[in-house]
């Protein structure tokens, strides 16, 4: 209580005239009471934790200190004690029904203070503090912000089954989501391509399961996977940053990775991407697979929630599907987990009961889930509407990029599909989640291509799911703010260029010995960009050489000794035929 009183006294001391306007952050603050003037924090200072709260808030302060360094170049030390002039002060206060677990109070006067009933609220307060300091060039408008989310679940789902994303990318995404107060990151760990694009041959159809398995050697994808330790470390990082990493193992459809490994559990009738629900071996396999990640004192799936898929099974097997779903909802729950699934029960109607208590459904399609009936039955739902919230890169159906303006100006969390809208505050409507599905395996889309699509979506949906009401400013103002905001402290996946680019130790010429190079001050350049260069090939040169290289891509001359120019990003190679003996001037790669 004393910490809250301290902040309130700080607010009362602010001059009543010349009120400061509400600071610009994403998502926008719920409440702001402006004071007079600005608090200019020093480039070297202190983060002070209330002595009684050190155990709960030390990790928050440590992350904040590193973020101040990465974002602004500031050096802040962490200590405990009482508030100090021009310092950042973190503390906990008594429970507050409106603030809940995620709300906080941020006040700027003699010092910058963040207080909240729970650690998570203080952490979200530091995200707002960082954004304000970035946008205000190191200053804080004096005043008091009171902020809380309208919806508790605000997330993003990434299909890593059809396309591998590096663990480094996933770890960076935890920080990006956290910076915009998106608190769920669902990892879709297995899936497969469409058989019609692989000569209608299930054996040729791409499929992958991305997690290390000791019980089933050979199950894990060979073209990219995560060790158990890497995945548990990712979840721990999420906990540190307030992001719940939710693993999804998709069964009983989308399961070709499992039937490639164990063909006898595949369905001859509906296709090998369907598990055969009539074979005991299917249940033995799934039981053991789930147990591998759920059992033990330190399970691999260490968070509170686990997703079991359950979407798009053939409707002719509704009763057996409902039995299977009910069985695995109960099976996963016995390990102490909250279970999630994709909506399917409108499409697969039947008499077989399916557990509803403590089960959360992704409401993704009008045809597959009845949101009102689901809520009535006792399920909780998360709006993951395919029409508005699905990104399927370069597929030609669904959306390649989300309609950011429409989402900002029109969409609400309650708009669960194109025909049904739930009122704001509907009990059981937990929030929303947007999703990336990489349906077309190997289509040339890179990690950076996906991020180019998802980052603007994350910004606008963070705004809509946190505030839960009409936009604070016009779309044009919001879009301008989005473009000036960083992805997160220390992260530049977009490859934005700031300042002058120089060539350290610039040389007039390079020794063509295969080892000489020149480096720029910039590791990479993001979209949109164009590269122009002249190539004077040596007719006698018979080796592949690197023209340009960054952390995520490489441009080769004489790719594989075939006389081609090649652009390579992760596992994707794009080749261009060039004359082998003549100089090529102004060859443009965009």
Task: List each model region and its residues.
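Active-site neighborhood of glycoside hydrolase catalytic domains
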Residues: 258-360, 364-378
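Bacterial Sec-dependent N-terminal signal peptides
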Residues: 1-22
């Amino acid at each position: 209580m004393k910490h809250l009183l301290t902040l309130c006294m700080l607010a009362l001391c602010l001059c009543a005239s010349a009120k400061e306007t509400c600071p610009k952050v994403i998502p926008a603050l719920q409440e702001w009471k402006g004071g007079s003037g600005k608090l200019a924090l020093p480039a070297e200072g202190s983060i002070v934790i209330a002595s009684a709260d050190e155990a709960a808030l030390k990790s928050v302060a440590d992350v904040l200190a590193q973020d101040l360094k990465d974002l602004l170049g500031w050096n802040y030390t962490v200590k405990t004690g009482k508030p100090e002039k021009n310092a950042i002060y973190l503390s906990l206060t008594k429970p507050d029904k409106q603030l809940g677990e995620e709300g906080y109070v941020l006040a700027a006067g003699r010092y910058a203070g963040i207080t909240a009933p729970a650690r998570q609220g203080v952490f979200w307060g530091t995200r707002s503090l960082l954004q304000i300091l970035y946008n205000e060039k190191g200053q804080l408008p004096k005043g008091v912000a009171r902020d809380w989310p309208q919806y508790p679940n605000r997330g993003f789902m990434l299909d890593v089954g059809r396309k591998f994303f590096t663990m480094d990318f996933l770890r960076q995404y935890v920080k990006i989501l956290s910076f915009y107060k998106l608190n769920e990151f669902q990892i879709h760990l297995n899936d497969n391509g469409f058989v019609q694009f692989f000569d209608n041959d299930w054996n040729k159809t791409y499929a992958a399961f991305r997690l290390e398995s000791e019980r089933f050697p050979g199950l894990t994808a060979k073209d990219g996977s995560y060790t158990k330790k890497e995945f548990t470390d990712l979840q721990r990082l999420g906990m540190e940053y307030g992001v719940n990493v939710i693993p999804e193992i998709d069964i009983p459809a989308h399961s070709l990775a499992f039937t490639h490994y164990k063909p006898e559990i595949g369905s001859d009738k509906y296709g090998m991407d369907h598990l055969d629900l009539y074979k005991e071996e299917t249940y033995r396999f799934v039981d053991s697979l789930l147990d591998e990640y759920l059992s033990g004192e330190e399970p691999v799936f260490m968070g509170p929630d686990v997703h079991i898929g359950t979407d798009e099974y053939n409707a002719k097997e509704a009763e057996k599907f409902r039995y299977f779903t009910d069985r695995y909802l109960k099976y996963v729950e016995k390990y102490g987990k909250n279970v999630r699934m994709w909506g399917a029960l409108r499409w697969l109607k039947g008499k077989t009961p399916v557990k509803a208590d403590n089960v959360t459904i992704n409401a993704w399609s009008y045809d597959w889930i009845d949101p009102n009936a689901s809520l009535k039955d006792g399920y909780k739902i998360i709006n993951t509407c395919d029409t508005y919230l699905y990104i399927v890169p370069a597929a030609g159906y669904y959306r390649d990029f989300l309609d950011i303006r429409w989402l900002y100006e029109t969409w609400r969390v309650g708009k669960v599909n194109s025909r049904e809208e739930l009122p704001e505050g509907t009990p059981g409507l937990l929030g929303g989640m947007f999703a990336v599905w990489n349906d077309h395996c190997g289509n040339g889309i890179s990690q950076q291509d996906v991020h180019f699509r998802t980052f603007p979506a994350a910004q606008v949906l963070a705004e809509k799911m946190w505030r839960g009401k009409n936009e604070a400013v016009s779309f044009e103002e919001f879009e301008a703010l989005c473009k000036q905001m960083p992805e997160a402290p220390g992260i530049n996946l977009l490859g934005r260029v700031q300042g002058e680019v120089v060539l350290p130790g610039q040389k007039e010429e390079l020794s063509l010995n295969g080892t000489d190079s020149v480096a720029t001050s910039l590791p990479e350049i993001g979209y949109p960009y164009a590269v122009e260069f002249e190539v004077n090939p040596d007719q006698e040169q018979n080796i592949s050489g690197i023209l340009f290289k960054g952390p995520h891509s490489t441009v080769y001359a004489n790719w594989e000794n075939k006389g081609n120019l090649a652009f390579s990003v992760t596992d994707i190679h794009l080749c261009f035929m060039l004359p082998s003996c003549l100089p090529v001037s102004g060859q443009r790669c965009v």
